[in-house]
Regions:
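Mobile active-site "lid"/loop adjacent to the S-adenosyl-L-methionine
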Residues: 75-102
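Conserved Class I SAM-dependent methyltransferase catalytic core
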Residues: 99-148
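SAM/dcSAM-binding transferase cores
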Residues: 151-196
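Hydrophobic alpha-helix-in-membranes signature
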Residues: 74-75, 121
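Short, catalytically relevant binding-site loops at active-site mouths
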Residues: 59-60, 77-79, 124-127, 149
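Conserved SAM/SAH cofactor-binding pocket of Class I
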Residues: 1-64, 70-73, 79-84
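S-adenosyl-L-methionine-dependent methyltransferase catalytic core, i.e., the SAM/SAH-binding region
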Residues: 70, 138, 144-145, 157-161
Length: 196
């Protein structure tokens, strides 16, 4: 499993928990994030299967010949918007260090022929990523649109799954809250096994 932009390692830890025989590699360009990730990895029961590297996706794809069966990412997603005065915050939230096209190119190079790529993005950015993957014949096979509440008109995030082989697309709407301060049954179900 490859976690692109691992941050503090939360997705990597979740993957190690859900896939007990998998090795997980987290990559990030921020040294403090990688150090925090490694600390979190050392404190977990899966530490022998977790690695973190300070390297960009652009560099990693050039040096690693492995194909991954699963790639996950919660990538930077703000495009052409006001950046922060903090370069760390800007890199974590904006596509200045990893564009949608670079993400698509890297995933195409590193994903095995039967592998899956999962990511979490705002709705508009997810549309742009789907378009970027067209060049590589990578298709969105599942999309879950996440809303804060059932009566909301706009999704706050899309959880997308991509595959190199064309298959049918599954589309769902899901909600985080049933009402203010009360998580939905779906949200409780998907987070029930996470040990964080």
């Amino acid at each position: 499993v490859l976690d692109i932009g691992c941050g503090c390692g939360i997705l990597s830890l979740g993957m190690a928990q859900f896939f007990p025989s998998a090795s997980v590699v987290g990559i990030d360009i921020d040294e403090d994030s990688v150090n925090e990730t490694m600390g979190n990895f050392r404190q977990s029961r899966w530490c022998n299967r977790l690695k973190a590297n300070k390297i960009s996706l652009q560099e990693y794809q050039l040096h690693d010949g492995n194909a991954f069966d699963l790639i996950v990412s919660n990538p930077p997603f703000f495009e052409n918007s006001l950046t922060s005065s903090s370069s760390v915050r800007t890199n974590a939230r904006h596509t200045v260090a990893l564009s949608i096209d670079e993400l698509a190119f890297g995933v195409n190079r590193l994903l095995s022929s039967d592998g899956l790529f999962y990511c979490v993005l705002p709705l508009q950015t997810s549309v742009n990523l789907k378009l970027a993957f067209v060049e590589y014949s990578i298709c969105c096979v599942s999309e879950v649109r996440v809303f804060s509440f059932e009566n909301d008109n706009t999704a706050i995030r899309s959880i997308l799954a991509f595959k190199k082989k064309l298959t049918c697309k599954n589309f769902e709407n899901r909600y985080i809250y049933e009402e203010p301060n009360k998580h939905s049954q779906w949200y409780k179900w998907i987070t029930r096994d996470l040990l964080l």
